[in-house]
């Protein structure tokens, strides 16, 4: 079993170290992670400059690029053999609902998914790493389950773990993505040099945290497991858009 491990918080992040330690013994682990924090990088690739690859003293490989860069470079240029699984995390904070569109953690797993490799993203829903060992224990259980009984391809799982002791977790729940309210307004401020700058505001609160969602499950103390897909086609609108676009198509 060959497992590629990445994240978006950087190769020095406690969440990555805890995940690698938890997965030890399950297979041959290769760690390729960003040199610096790339939270919110989504699926971006670096196309305007070359990437450098270095190895840390603990054997972790780090890249001066995004999470997607890391997995892409690993799969197409670093690893001698294709991995059986790609895992990402453990993220410092939740990746639920709309977060998944922006998440570098989910993006690293998505890159593996795009290459046809089963992929899992792990996030601890509160920042600060308070119960990171418990989160890593839960992550290992999910990976063990995938190894023991692999899901049929394609596989992209988004796993959010409550910030509590493992003994206080209430099991696992298969969920759908919830939804957040729009983000808070940007924060405008002025630098000491008189330049106006803007900070992106905090994420919005949960708008859909009803039973069955990732928000609801984690609030109940459950580990949320959400299967994702990357087909962005709105299939239910295809016929409506065909009718709407008919005059355009005729005149084309």
From Swiss-Prot:
Residues binding a divalent metal cation: 8-9, 39, 91
The protein's name: 5'-nucleotidase SurE
Family as reported in the entry's similarity comment: Belongs to the SurE nucleotidase family.
Keywords: Cytoplasm, Hydrolase, Metal-binding, Nucleotide-binding
Function: Nucleotidase that shows phosphatase activity on nucleoside 5'-monophosphates.
Species annotation: Bordetella parapertussis (strain 12822 / ATCC BAA-587 / NCTC 13253)
Primary localization class, coarse: cytoplasm
GO molecular function: 3'-nucleotidase activity; 5'-nucleotidase activity; exopolyphosphatase activity; metal ion binding; nucleotide binding
Gene responsible for this protein: surE
Catalyzed chemical reaction(s): a ribonucleoside 5'-phosphate + H2O = a ribonucleoside + phosphate
One GO cellular component, as annotated: cytoplasm
InterPro entries hit by this protein: SurE, SurE-like_Pase/nucleotidase, SurE-like_sf
Protein localization: Cytoplasm
EC numbers on record: 3.1.3.5
CC cofactor: a divalent metal cation
Xref: NCBIfam families: PRK00346.1-3, PRK00346.1-4, surE
Annotated TM spans: none
HAMAP family: SurE
Disulphide linkage map: none
